[in-house]
Amino acid sequence: GELGFEPGELERATAIAAHANLALQNSERYSQGKERAFIDDVTEVYNARFLLQATDREVQRAERYAKPLSVLFLDLDRFKNVNDRHGHLVGSQVLRRLSQVLKECIRQVDTLARYGGDEFTILLADTGAEAGMQIAERIRRTVAHTLFEGGGGEPIRLTISIGVAGFPEHGRDRTGLL
């Protein structure tokens, strides 16, 4: 036949290709959906569910290769005032912008997650507690010097409290570190 196909073969090949294409699209959608389950809706960074898995993974890695690991706990000071004064929409925008600022302060190999509310956690791979404290101080200063946009363009200044825990000195597992 035409193009070397027997009658009906071209239709079958076209149908098989269409099914394969659909299967690939479904697989991609599933993968994206699964990934979305680990992303915080407001800030677009990882959520607490992902953080728990990532902490387990990083602790195992630190143990296996005898490498340090630091965990930073960040809590915005008096963030309730931002929500009360400017509304939750502005509060969400501030949290989203804060997430961007935090991402700029860490390496790509580090993990930033919104733990909940106005709390964030950062996993610093291959980083001891001493270096973790220096990074925490740099983040604290950066946030304090960043102007966040409030309602009506009014600038909002934030301060942040940061705790640092190191593996293995402060904890040898997720429970001890978080």
List each model region and its residues.
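Residue-level recognition of strand-loop junctions within catalytic nucleotide-signaling folds
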Residues: 25, 84, 124-127, 144, ...
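Catalytic-core segments of nucleotide cyclases and related cyclic-nucleotide turnover enzymes
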Residues: 7, 129, 133-137, 152, ...
